[in-house]
């Protein structure tokens, strides 16, 4: 057991939150906060008890200056209000270092295929929302490395993910709501690589409370071997960032540099769609990303990327690149038509289905499958249905929803047949979605319905619209 403290010092990453209560704190309380902060994160020796207020040479002043420089504050060495405010913000508890860094000793996984297991669930969210947040967090890192992940439902996985309160068996007890958020361990056997989340926090899938996806993505960075970054835009920056719009999330180049220093870039794979080296240059008729009146024909995912179709073009949005790329549909799939009506991905089949008029095509990567196009009526639609407005596949339930005017049908992907009892009214089961739907797709556990230049973020579990956004927010507008 004598080696355990050293092991934990090297491997544990504890996320701590210091809530701002808005009340004035006494000087002694502030000094105690600063003392502990500098001890925990900037290696201030614990026997340094007196703060030097007038000399720039004091050890505490030096550490304050170091902290201010690292976190992007004005470097004064003084305990101004900005410095104290930052010290109280949610953050990870591992010491701060410059730029991206790995843990001491540079621990990393010696294999590229890793397993994970969700041991238990928080009552704050439906199980499928937790599953989706974790899957998306893993995908953040999978997109930019050779790493792949698969889920185990029993036994020991490389990354064990669990929710717990207070003492939970790893010598780092949680402390109730508002302080420690989560902690994760660097790569290695046993507890190493695992991520624990404080179940006294209010976990959410949106921008209220503590967003599970954002915290999980950060913690998994630690599970893969990353330390902290001084880059304020980085996911691995020590302070917790709550986004007002999750559609704008992207991995910073600093994070990419860090993880690729451990594992390298993603390999070229025959399973990955072939990409033209350059997006199409602007020309007459090319849609402008940030046109306030921009609407979309169809939206789908494809192996972790987002495809947004408009006329004869489509945007490709990937975590690997900061900006979405615009391409001609014909440059990927020469036999597909322009101006498609609907698109959706069935991840279990590794297929994307594209609809136009009374026909549909199946694509896998950059290949249109043989035997297509087929008529939409082979799916079980009545002759009165001439086209599909929008479609989305719920991967947790293995059901696909087809939207046609003010009604919708549901298709069972396992049985490969339309379910009885449909169509139903969209407004009854999707309250708040009362306009004609141009496109729809799923991300972050939400359904995003596009109508003209607007989109509605819909929570399928709560059955309500949670946000109204511009359609082109996915294009960084």
From Swiss-Prot:
InterPro entries: Hemopexin-like_dom (IPR000585), Hemopexin-like_dom_sf (IPR036375), Hemopexin-like_repeat (IPR018487), Hemopexin_CS (IPR018486), M10A_MMP (IPR033739), MetalloPept_cat_dom_sf (IPR024079), Pept_M10_metallopeptidase (IPR001818), Pept_M10A (IPR021190)
Pfam family, one: Hemopexin
UniProt catalytic activity: Preferential cleavage where P1', P2' and P3' are hydrophobic residues
Residues that, per the record, bind Zn(2+) 2: 92, 218, 222, 228
Residues where Ca(2+) 1 binds: 124, 199, 201
Record's compositionally biased regions (Pro residues): 276-285
Identification of the protein by name: Stromelysin-1
Organism: Homo sapiens
């Amino acid at each position: 057991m004598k080696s355990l403290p050293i092991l934990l010092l090297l491997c544990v990453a504890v996320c701590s939150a210091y809530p701002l209560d808005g009340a004035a704190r006494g000087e002694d309380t502030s000094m105690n906060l600063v003392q502990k902060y500098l001890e925990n994160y900037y290696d201030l020796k614990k026997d340094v008890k007196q703060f030097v207020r007038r000399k720039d040479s004091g050890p505490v002043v030096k550490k304050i200056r170091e902290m201010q420089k690292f976190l992007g504050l004005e470097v004064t060495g003084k305990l101004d209000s900005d410095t104290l405010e930052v010290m109280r913000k949610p953050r990870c508890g591992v010491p701060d270092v410059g730029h991206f860094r790995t843990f001491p000793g540079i621990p990393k996984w010696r294999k590229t295929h890793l397993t994970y297991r969700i041991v238990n669930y928080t009552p704050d969210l439906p199980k499928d929302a937790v599953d989706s947040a974790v899957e998306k967090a893993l995908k953040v890192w999978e997109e930019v490395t050779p790493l792949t992940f698969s889920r185990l439902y029993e036994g020991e996985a490389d990354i064990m993910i669990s929710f717990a309160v207070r003492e939970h068996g790893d010598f780092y007890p949680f402390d109730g709501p508002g302080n420690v958020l989560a902690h994760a361990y660097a790569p290695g056997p046993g507890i190493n690589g695992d991520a624990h989340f404080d179940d006294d926090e209010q976990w959410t899938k949106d921008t209220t409370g503590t967003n599970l996806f954002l915290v999980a993505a950060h913690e998994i960075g630690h599970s893969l071997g990353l330390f902290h970054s001084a880059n304020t835009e980085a996911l691995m920056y020590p302070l917790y960032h709550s986004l007002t719009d999750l559609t704008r999330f992207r991995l910073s180049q600093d994070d990419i540099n860090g993880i690729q220093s451990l594992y390298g870039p993603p390999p070229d794979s025959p399973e990955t769609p072939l990409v033209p080296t350059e997006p199409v240059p602007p020309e007459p008729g090319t849609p402008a990303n940030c046109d306030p009146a921009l609407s979309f024909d169809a939206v789908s995912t494809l192996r972790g990327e987002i495809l947004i179709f408009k006329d004869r073009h489509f945007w490709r949005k990937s975590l690997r690149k900061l900006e979405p790329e615009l391409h001609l549909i014909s440059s990927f799939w020469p036999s597909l038509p322009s101006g498609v009506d609907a698109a959706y991905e069935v991840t279990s089949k590794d297929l994307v289905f594209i609809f136009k008029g009374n026909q549909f095509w199946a694509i896998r990567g950059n290949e249109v499958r043989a035997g297509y196009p087929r008529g939409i009526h082979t799916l079980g639609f009545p002759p009165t249905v001439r086209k599909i407005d929008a479609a989305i596949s719920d991967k947790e339930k293995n059901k696909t929803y087809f939207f046609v005017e003010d009604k919708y049908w549901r298709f069972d992907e396992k049985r490969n047949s339309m379910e009885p009892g449909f169509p139903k009214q969209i407004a009854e089961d999707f309250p708040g979605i009362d306009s004609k739907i141009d496109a729809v797709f799923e991300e972050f556990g939400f359904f995003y319905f596009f109508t003209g230049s607007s989109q509605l973020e819909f929570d399928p579990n709560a059955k309500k619209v949670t946000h109204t956004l511009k359609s082109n927010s996915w294009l960084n507008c």
